[in-house]
Amino acid sequence: MPRLLILVAVLLLSGCLTAPPKQAAKPTLMPRAQSYKDLTHLPAPTGKIFVSVYNIQDETGQFKPYPASNFSTAVPQSATAMLVTALKDSRWFIPLERQGLQNLLNERKIIRAAQENGTVAMNNRIPLQSLTAANIMVEGSIIGYESNVKSGGVGARYFGIGADTQYQLDQIAVNLRVVNVSTGEILSSVNTSKTILSYEVQAGVFRFIDYQRLLEGEIGYTSNEPVMLCLMSAIETGVIFLINDGIDRGLWDLQNKADRQNDILVKYRELSVPPES
């Protein structure tokens, strides 16, 4: 009987075993969700629109819980760069540099000064063109981050041998809005959210198999969905909704009218009504 218990314990623990990485992963492109595939496979527009993005602020006021850090924010502060990337990847917009506008203006001043005193390099002898103005601005912010929206788990233990799993869901929410540069009118606005999954699996054994002989062992692992990827997915989804809403409102149009029945556009059109909480 003791041997049988040992065998069961070993099998139980080995079944939950996840081998730790032997070395750090090599640099690679950032993984992307289904929202990125949808964004990059949208039907073509009649013409691309010049758009400017200044600053997507974090309005959550959330910080990482102790003991991780009391000074690091709970959500990434790179939402502006993510939105610019999403707008460009959609092939519907031409983003104009606005986040680093001061750096761009300084560089142009250096070129003009060199042109005036005759010391300009060969690659900058052509007079600078005026900066392109945007037709619309995309404003927005990270409007919410809620931790432990839902949690749960399941487990079992028999004669000191058992296993359990637990999970937790957090949620991040983003607001995006399209603003007419000429009038300041808000043409379209959307709120999107994405859940963040964290889970833990562990197993262990704690049992006396003989007098003064104790068998004890445990193993487990945790997996946390990166907040950065969830924020990127929420922004990409928001851009798709803005494009779809703009088509319906006549703000912009498709190159091919028949593409209104495109599978991706139809899917997001059906999702335009928020689900009940």
Swiss-Prot record:
The keyword Cell membrane applies. InterPro entries: Curli_assmbl/transp-comp_CsgG (IPR005534). A lipid is attached at C16 (S-diacylglycerol cysteine). Keywords: Cell membrane, Lipoprotein, Membrane, Palmitate, Signal. A lipid is attached at C16 (N-palmitoyl cysteine). The keyword Transit peptide does not apply. It is found in: Cell membrane. Its main location: membrane. It is a lipid-anchor. Pfam families: CsgG. Residues 1-15 form the signal peptide. GO terms for cellular component: outer membrane-bounded periplasmic space; plasma membrane. May be involved in the biogenesis of curli organelles. Belongs to the CsgG family. PANTHER family: CURLI PRODUCTION ASSEMBLY/TRANSPORT COMPONENT CSGG, CURLI PRODUCTION ASSEMBLY_TRANSPORT COMPONENT CSGG. This is Curli production assembly/transport component CsgG. It comes from Salmonella typhimurium (strain LT2 / SGSC1412 / ATCC 700720). The lineage of its organism: Bacteria, Pseudomonadati, Pseudomonadota, Gammaproteobacteria, Enterobacterales.
